Amino acid sequence: SRTMTQLSNLKVPKENYHVVLTKASIVEREVPPKYYGQAARVIENRLAQVDGETQGKLQMDSTVLYGLGRSGGIPAPEEATDPNNQYNTYVHPGLPPGPIGSPSEDAIKAVLNPPAGSWLYFVTVNLDTGETLFSSTSEEQAANTKKLNDYCAKNKDTCNGGKKSG
């Protein structure tokens, strides 16, 4: 397939295909292309932080929604806490069981070579432009999430269709 050829051309060892595709598919569902690298770094940082603030949980809406058979929107609070959804990265630490889509080569490249950074969080604060803010602390994330909430208060129809936050 095209994806397998891309992985081979990028010199990804076959034993890493599953992990790379899983990470890249999440990156692609979560953020616009210009933020792929930063989102890939967030995933790496969260996976590495098993004893820290995030406890190795990705906490990505896109994975929860995939497990529910949906894309776009925001999981309801009870959906985000449901342990029966194996793709619920709010509950289950580490990567979900598999990819949540077929990622682009750009998303794969971002996962293979994420930029340096201490980011643990991100939130898309403008759903029209895709503007996404990255942060290293839960306090910074709370301030950024307030920006999304302010945007949503003025753009209810847009926000009811979805939020991207990780």
What residue spans do the PLM features occupy?
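Bacterial extracytoplasmic/cell-wall-associated proteins, especially those involved in peptidoglycan
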Residues: 1-166
